[in-house]
Amino acid sequence: MKENTFDIEKVTYSMKEERFVEALSSLEFNLASQPNHFECLYLAAVCSRYLKNYKDAQNYLDRLLRVNPDMGRAYQELGHLNRINGKMRSAIAYYRQACELNPALIASWNYLFEYYKKNKNKQAADHAAEQIKKLQSIPNILLYISQILNEGKLAIAEEKCREFLKKNPTNTYAMSLLSDIADRLGHFDDTEILLENAVKFKPEDGELRMKYALILRKKQKFKETMEQVNILCEKFPDNLSYQAHRASEVMQNGDHEKAVK
């Protein structure tokens, strides 16, 4: 059975219906012919965890990480397994690693927030809360696209992102995601156009404008970059990161005295 003929959506639907035995049976059948199928190994681990077959779940994750060591969702699953087994310190380390590899994993952020809050680490808790708030505001399909994009599945991410934008042409988060894909593929003109339009739709979004400034910088449009950074500093005068970017741009343009003011 070829990888692209296996019906992952049917399996995930079974899992949503909590028919984990049925889903796992389908996954194991496919793994017999495709033992290194990333998604099958991951979903088999999830099914095994829900069925409380924790040793099997660990074995699936071990196999998965041998062939795909940078899959954030796998580390999130390791976090779940360690948390269930009472190994909270290890669980937090895995959740943190999951978020570093894939910042769109809201479950990991939730557990990190609860842990940091309980341990009175306000700065870390506030950061986790900010990420959770951002992710909760995103439609589920865009959250999924973010996750697969972070796993390097550019073709699928682009296809689904374009489908979403056809129905929601002014959604700036989707435009930003598509710009990330274009940037990774080296299509810098497309990246610039997408971010330019996104900034027009949402001019008060500092993160969007910063991304726009960075692609302008990458394309060596120094004057336009400086214009965007100046706007950021005017709109967000207390943001030290934006101030640092402006100083860097001034230095790049040769005005050293102005940069240190």
What are these regions (language model features)?
Residues N4, F38-E39, G72-Q76, I106-A107, ...:
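Helix-start (N-cap) detector for alpha-helical repeat units in TPR-like alpha-solenoids
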Residues T5-S33, L43-Y50, N140-K167:
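Alpha-helical segment of the N-proximal tetratricopeptide repeat
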